Amino acid sequence: MRPQLKFLVLFLISAITLLLQGCFPLAATGIGAAVLMVDDRRSTGVYVEDENIEWKARGRLIERFKDVHVNVTSFNLNVLLTGEVPSEQMKQEIGDAIRSIASVKMVTNELSVGGNTAYTARTNDTFITTNVKTRFINNGKFSINHVKVVTEAGTAYLMGIVTREEGDAATELARTTSGVSRVVKVFEYSEAAGKR
């Protein structure tokens, strides 16, 4: 039995046991995370560390920088920064602060200098992200769990561990999605990825 499948079976048995003990919310959350992790190309440790990086980064942003709209997305220890800041200096300072987190390998700083976007623009970005992901699912050429989509001001950022073919397919689908003005690839390419 494949290690991932064995993990899923053991996890589901544990979750059922918790359900029988009345711990439904905890079990439901755990089941969702386990299903995502089984199809993820990152190791469980890296998956968890990506979550930790995002929490640490948010903490640093709240502590040091006020009134900024910064999104922090970590995938395989590579961090993407999107949003708006009031100055080029603050953009650099935020990038440096995130780079100093111990486990971060690389920071792609796509922060733009200017005023914060309006709520309607952010809602539109969420809608675009949903449309891109829906097109990924309908296309079926790769798992939606292999490509993370972040949209900011109409720009779709694509992250993941992918083969060249998967990256090209994801880029083309995102590029031709209504509302997307630009696509930025933040992929890690691995031919071995197609075997997982």
Residue ranges of predicted features:
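N-terminal targeting leaders
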Residues: R2-F7, G22-R196
